[in-house]
Every structure is written in C-alpha cells, then in structure tokens.
UniProtKB/Swiss-Prot annotation:
It comes from Human immunodeficiency virus type 2 subtype A (isolate ST/24.1C#2) (HIV-2). Residues 614-646 form a coiled coil. SUPFAM superfamilies: gp120 core, Virus ectodomain. Glycans are attached at residues 36, 69, 78, 113, 119, 131, 137, 145, 160, 173, 200, 232, 235, 242, 266, 272, 283, 294, 304, 359, 392, 402, 405, 442, 457, 460, 605, 614, 630. Specific enzymatic cleavages in vivo yield mature proteins. Envelope glycoproteins are synthesized as an inactive precursor that is heavily N-glycosylated and processed likely by host cell furin in the Golgi to yield the mature SU and TM proteins. The cleavage site between SU and TM requires the minimal sequence [KR]-X-[KR]-R. Disulfide bonds join C43-C56, C100-C208, C107-C199, C112-C157, C221-C251, C231-C243, C299-C332, C384-C441, C391-C414. This is Envelope glycoprotein gp160.
Length: 712
C-alpha cells in the first residue's frame, strides 16, 4: 500500500513538472539591444556658404549624450563613420574646387628653355649650412625674402598644333611650372624636348573656374531609429575590443574639413596631451599634438601674379603665365614650440603599448618619405585659398631634429602646381593657375600623419600622405549602431495564462536615446520598464524625425533634390520604416503592439537560460543570436496554427448568438447536409434490401433450366 502511495505521489510530481517546468518562448519589445550598422549618415553645419548648404543640413545644436554601463568594441579603421566622412569630404572638396571639364591631355612634344630661378622648391640650397629661425618681428616675413627663398622655376615652351584651321599648324608659346613638365634627360643643350607629366593619363579634368576651398565645421547625425556610440576612454588608441566607458549620442562632435598630407590642420581633437591612434594590424598612425605648444603654420604666396588663357583649338583652353615673368616662391612658416612638441611625441611613442622599438628618444627620428614618391607624398601638400602648395620640408626636419651641418630653418619653400593627383581616387585634375594678388593662410597644426617603423637600434617616424587618416582621429571613437528592440527569452508562462495586472504610469520621454538608458542593467530590471521604453522609443523616433524635418524645411536648397537632398530626405523616413517592419514582424507572431508577449512555442534549448539578475539584454542577445532564425520560424508556424484553431473555434461558436439562428444562409447549408444524410440512408436501405432478397432466393430456388434426367 505504501509503495502504491509513493508511486502515485511521484506520478503527480512528474505531471506537475511537465506542466510547470516547461519553458516557453516569450517575446519582449523594447529591450536595449543593438547591432552594428552601415546606413548613410546625414551631416549638419552652421556654414551658410552655397556649396556647404547644398551638402549639409543646418545645425540646430539640439543634441545629447547618455552614458551606458556596457562594454563595446571600437575600431577607427574598420568604421563606417570614418569611411563616410572621407567620401563626403572628397565630395565637398570637388564641389568647392570644381575641376569639372574633362579634356584630352596635351601630349605633344615641346621645345623648352629652362629659366631657372635663384632657388627652387624641389632642391633648396644645402651647399652651405645656415641656421635661421624667424620670429614675429622678422622683417623678411613682410618682404617675403627670407634666406633661401627665391623665384619659381619656370620653363618657356614652343609647340605646334592643328585644330583652329584645317590642316594648318600653328605655333604656340606657353610657360609652365617646371614641376608640370618632364624633359628628356639625354638632351644636353639648353633647349630640351619636353612633355606634360600627365601624358600617361587617358583623361584629366580641368577646372571650370577658380574657387576657394575654405574649411567648414560640420557634424554627422544618425537617422532616427539608429544611434552613435562613442568610446569615452582616455586610453583609447584607435583600436579597443573592450571599451568600458561608452556613451550614446545622436550626433558626432563638430569637426573640420581637412585636406593635407603630413600634418592635420584645425582639428577638433587636440588636448593638453599627446596621444597616438595606431592601426590594429599595421604601422599606420595618426598622432594628436599637444595644444599647449601653440603649433601653427602661416603660408604665403607673394603677389604680382598674372594669368593669360591660351586657346589651343576649339573647346580646348589652357591658362598659363606670361612668358618671362616669374613669381616669387610661396613659403610656409612654422610657429610655436615645435622642438618641444616633437620631443613629447617621441616620449609618447616610447610609452605606447603597441610600440616595440627602442626607448631611447635620441634614436627616434622624423624622416621624409622617399624622393621618388608622388609629389603629394614627398612634399607637404596643402590647399591655401584654392591653391595647391607643395612644400619641401627638408629645412624644417633639419631644424626640429637639430641636424648639424645641414641647413635649418623654421620655414620652408613651397611650389604651386596646376596638375594635381587626386587624394581620394586615382586620377589627375588640372586647375587654373594661381589667382592674382597675395595669398595668406594661417592654420593650427593639430596632428601628424605617420608610419612607425620601429627597431632595437632606430625608429623612424615617416610622414605619410594618407589624408583619410585625419578622419580616423576626428571620428574614430564613434561607431554606428541600429537599435533592435525585439528580444526572446524563456519563461514558464504560456500564452493565455493570467498575468499580474500592471499599474499604469506616466512616461518620461527622454527622446530616442532614453531608450538605451537601461542597456547596462540586468535583464530583469530592464524588463520591468518595457512598456514605458517602447512608448519612449516611438515618441523619441517621432520627436527625432520632427527635428530632422524642421531642418530640412529650413534648407531651401533641398527643394532641388540633389543627391544629398534625396539622401537626407530618405533618412527622415528610415525610422518609420524600421518601426513598421518591427510591428509587422511582431504581428506575424501574434504579438503586435505588445511589450511582453507569451507564446505556446517551447524554448528550444533547456540548457540555455538567462540569469535575469546578472546579465544584460545585449549579452543575452549575443548568446542566442544563432537561435533567432529558428525561434522566429517556430513563432510564425505557431501563429498560423493558432489562427487555424481560432477559425475552427469561431465556426463552432457561431450558434451561441441567438440572431445567428435566423440566418438563412446557415439554415440552407444545414438543410443541404440533412438532404444528403436522408438520401444516403435511403440508398443504404435499398442496398440492404437487395442483398437480403438475393440471400433468400439462394436458399429455396431451383433453376428453371436444369440438366435433363438420364435414362438408362
């Protein structure tokens, strides 16, 4: 008897466990979960010039940041934000400078005479050493005749071309910068055979008009439904798989458009310290300079410059200098405590965790790239008021490195070129010769672009021409994310089970970023506020879209529907599309407009359950990412079956309403069923009757025609 009781109790416990221990999939809407995204960002600026207005929306300064208690990976080089910045600044650059007419290169042989000036950009005088450091009160700054500076090196050329008149050649005279032509070295006489140095290019682009390239400040903003995360760790060096100080933002900080090699100008990341962003897999670096040293660069191009157009043939015009007029060289002066700043760079490099070279700063040197590199690499290349300067940095490097027996100056000679290698895409642009009058540019030097080649005996910091690296420093601590508010987790509650009544409460709308405030909280704590969070999400999305719509309305250029205009307008509808997509997915599971939705689908993996008090939703989502597809499919199948069951139930329950008894269509249908049943019964009785009659006949029946009796 006792054994039977124990068996009964065990069976009860087993039944209870089967009922209550089964875990079911529960859908949560409004969880703080995100994943990396790569959608287009839109830019905002306060610059009101024409081309900047076309490219970006007006800036309204209505942005916020919220600290998150999470750990996230950041990479300045594998980053959609920095890549978009490079692409967009290139677009701004081309829009401003406007090299817009494509021409066939001028590749005829020319007879040229060299008119060598006193000193040239490419080979500054180094036969006699000189140490000249100019200051604010130096007279040569005003007269542009500092030691070593001379006139531009030019070449006077003659060549024949046809085109203006049929089968008739015309002799042209043209003066070129010596850097824009290549002469045959075998010629020893004064008159040499020369070609333009772009003749190996199939198509080049010539500037339509002379334009300024003034830097502009702008910021990037994420479309509604997306956000930007920023690593706020002071030790962040461009690559950090576990950044623990993370903030969420709708927009980036303001940044400057920068286009230069060797140095970055007017950056926004300078602090009272020197720090280095280092590529995670090679020796590329971008070094942020300490703003304490007040490092600036002043570039000047003396006046007395004239330009004349030369018509080569119909539709082909080149602009040139008048013959035998040589302008004075452009030059750049480096102001500030440069030697101290460079020493601090070396000390910072020696302490960097990625650095494996010598710790002796005397063996760490700044060097220039090889002379055989492209001009933009071999020289410091920058843009001053629309003109492209190529500066030979030999004097400067000798000065900061204190190289004895070498010419040392804190200024360098520069050369202006018409034919430019594009810095972002492979190609060449031909720009108009420099405009007349004096040009002056003053910029703050905030960073160095360099490659680090370290060794036990010596380390070389080689200046680089990677313009894109400037934006790794400006925006490399950001990453773009897409908020995915739908989450799955196992619970013991099955659909249609009674749930505790929740008291209603007001929602404090923090905007869209308020949606992420519980990202660092445990799953259980975050789940308690899902109802408020989902409403916050929708309210924040609508608010964010309204702000974007306001700035679009304020920009009249958007009515032209340029490429950027359509891009920014598309950003406005991204969040609604995303929200509707989420709701459509929830609806396919029978969970539309619910914050917590219990289902009848059993949890697929009993060993994988969340610790509601010690794990965040972001961590949990990473664990079950491989199961989400199967869970989603199971939820859809369960919802389809649920709808079928509901349909059948509704058919059975259709007679419980008294009015349905008087529905003629229902009566006709069931009358048909009755007729079918009666006819079936009649047919069945007829079959039974025939069978019975045959059975009786077989028992007493003799055949009428039987075999005749046999007679003996």
């Amino acid at each position: 008897m006792c054994g039977r009781n124990q068996l009964f109790v065990a069976s009860l416990l087993a039944s209870a466990c089967l009922i209550y221990c089964v875990q079911y999939v529960t859908v949560f809407y409004g969880v703080p979960v995100w994943r990396n995204a790569s959608i287009p960002l839109f830019c905002a600026t306060k610059n009101r010039d024409t081309w900047g207005t076309i490219q970006c929306l007006p800036d309204n300064d209505d942005y916020q940041e919220i600290a998150l208690n999470v750990t996230e990976a950041f990479d300045a080089w594998n980053n959609t934000v920095t890549e978009q910045a490079v692409e967009d600044v290139w677009s701004l650059f081309e829009t401003s400078i406007k090299p817009c007419v494509k021409l066939t290169p001028l590749c005829v042989a020319m007879r040229c005479n060299s008119t060598t000036a006193k000193n040239t950009t490419s080979t500054p005088t180094t036969t006699t050493t000189a140490n000249t450091t100019i200051g604010e009160n130096s007279s040569c700054i005003r007269t542009d005749n500092c030691t070593g500076l001379g006139e531009e090196e030019m070449v006077d050329c003659q060549f024949n071309m046809t085109g203006l008149e049929r089968d008739k050649k015309k002799l042209y005279n043209e003066t070129w910068y010596s850097k824009d032509v290549v002469c045959e070295s075998k010629d020893t006489k004064k008159e040499k055979t020369c070609y333009m140095n772009h003749c190996n290019t199939s198509v080049i682009t010539e500037s339509c008009d002379k334009h300024y390239w003034d830097t502009m400040r702008f910021r990037y903003c994420a479309p509604p439904g997306f956000a930007l995360l920023r690593c706020n760790d002071t030790n962040y060096s461009g690559f950090e798989p576990n950044c623990s100080k993370v903030v969420a933002a709708t927009c980036t900080r303001m940044m400057e458009t920068q286009t230069s090699t060797w140095f970055g100008f007017n950056g926004t990341r300078a602090e009272n310290r020197t720090y280095i962003y280092w590529h995670g897999r090679d020796n590329r670096t971008i070094i942020s300079l300490n703003k304490f040293y007040n490092l600036t660069i002043l570039c000047k191009r003396p006046g007395n410059k004239t330009v004349v157009p030369i018509t080569l043939m119909s539709g082909l015009v080149f602009h040139s200098q008048p013959i035998n007029r040589r302008p004075r060289q452009a030059w750049c002066w480096f102001k500030g405590e440069w030697k101290e700043a460079m020493k601090e760079v070396k000390l910072t490099l020696a302490k960097h965790p990625r650095y494996k070279g010598t710790n002796d700063t005397e063996k760490i040197r700044f060097i220039a790239p090889g002379e055989r590199s492209d001009p933009e690499v071999a020289y410091m290349w920058t843009n001053c008021r629309g003109e492209f300067l190529y500066c030979n940095m030999t004097w400067f490097l000798n000065w900061v490195e204190n190289r004895t027996n070498q010419t040392q100056h804190n200024y360098v000679p520069c050369h202006i070129k018409q034919i430019i290698n594009t810095w972002h895409k492979v190609g060449k642009n031909v720009y108009l010769p420099p405009r007349e009058g004096q040009l002056t540019c003053n910029s703050t030097v905030t960073s160095i672009i360099a490659n680090i080649d370290g060794g036990e005996n010596q380390t070389n910091i080689t200046f680089s021409a990677e313009v894109a690296e400037l934006y790794r420093l400006e925006l490399g601590d950001y990453k773009l994310i897409e908020v995915t508010p739908i989450g799955f987790a196992p619970t013991s509650i099955k659909r249609y089970s009674s749930a505790p009544v929740r008291n209603k409460r007001g929602v404090f709308v923090l905007g869209f970023l308020g949606f992420l405030t519980t990202a660092g909280a445990a799953m259980g704590a975050a789940s308690l506020t899902l109802s408020a969070q989902s409403r916050t999400s929708l309210a924040g999305i609508v608010q964010q879209q309204q702000q974007l719509l306001d700035v679009v309305k304020r920009q009249q250029e958007m009515l032209r529907l340029t490429v950027w205009g359509t891009k920014n307008l598309q950003a406005r509808v991204t969040a609604i599309e995303k929200y509707l997509k989420d709701q459509a997915q929830l609806n396919s599971w029978g969970c539309a407009f619910r914050q917590v939705c219990h289902t009848t689908v059993p949890w697929v993996n009993d060993t994988l359950t969340p610790d509601w008090n010690n794990i965040t939703w972001q961590e949990w989502e990473q664990r079950i990412r491989n199961l989400e597809a199967n869970i989603s499919e199971s939820l859809e199948q369960a919802q389809i079956q649920q709808e079928k069951n509901m349909y059948e139930l509704q058919k059975l329950n259709s007679w419980d309403v008294f009015s349905n008894w008087f529905d003629l269509t229902s009566w006709i249908k069931y009358i048909q069923y009755g007729v079918y049943i009666v006819v079936g019964i009649i047919v069945l009785r007829m079959v039974i009757y025939v069978v019975q009659m045959l059975s009786r006949l077989r028992k007493g029946y003799r055949p009428v025609f039987s075999s005749p009796p046999a007679y003996s």
